[in-house]
Structure formats: C-alpha cells, structure tokens
A protein has these predicted regions:
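Acidic/His- and Gly-rich active-site-bordering loop/insert found
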Residues: 1-108
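Active-site alpha-helical elements of protease catalytic centers
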Residues: 107-122
Length: 122
C-alpha cells in the first residue's frame, strides 16, 4: 500500500492510476482507498456484489463522524474502460506519467483524479 504522504492529490492520483482496474477487475484500487481512508479515521467496509454469470464487483463504503445530522456524500468509481490498442498510447496507460505538468493515464480525469481530490480535501 502507498502511504497518503500528507494527502497530496498528485501522489494519490498516480497511485490509483497505477491500479489496472479495468471493468470489472479492481486490481487493488478499492483496497488502496480503504487503506488511506482508514488512516484518516474513516470506518471502511468493502462490499462484494455478486450476480450469477458475472464477475464479482467490489464497492467501498466509508464513513466518518457520527450518524446524527446532515451528511455529505462523495460518490465515484475506480474502474476504467479498457485502454484499447496500447501501441496508440505515447506512454504506458497505467504508469501515471507526469508530462508538462499533466498526469497521463487511464482514469486521470474519469475518475481517479477526482477521487484523489475528494480524499485530499477531506
């Protein structure tokens, strides 16, 4: 597991991109998120959804604070669509390379970068 390193969203985004979480396979992305959020004091539950004839799909439910009063929900997904023909990529789609100040990789904008922002803002 990669440590949070003060919640740096760049570090978190790169760590999530490096998980080859092509639908429906998780490749450790959910566990990585659970680890980070647990370190921050969240109670985390990893839920396994099963349906006959399909691959299992993991989901994460994380909660902090008491159950009284208003709640704020961050919702997202860690899976990405297949990268297609890798020869058409200028870099490894799961290497999370930083080029000219931009992070390049599967899920950088949909939606691993946003999830890293949720976590770092918490």
């Amino acid at each position: 597991m990669i440590n949070i390193e003060n919640g740096d969203p760049i570090v978190l985004t790169k760590a999530l991109i490096s998980c080859r979480s092509v639908t429906p396979h998780n490749d450790g992305a959910i566990e990585q998120l659970s680890h980070w959020l647990s370190e921050m004091g969240f109670k985390c539950d990893i839920l396994n959804f099963k349906e006959d004839g399909t691959d299992d799909v993991l989901n994460l439910w994380a909660r902090i604070g008491n159950e009284e009063g208003p709640a704020l929900c961050f919702a997202g997904h860690t899976d990405v669509v297949p990268e297609g023909d890798e020869t058409r990529w200028s870099t490894d789609p799961f290497a999370a390379n930083e080029i000219d100040g931009k992070i390049i990789g599967r899920g950088a904008t949909d939606m691993k970068g946003a999830i890293a922002s949720f976590v770092s803002a918490t």
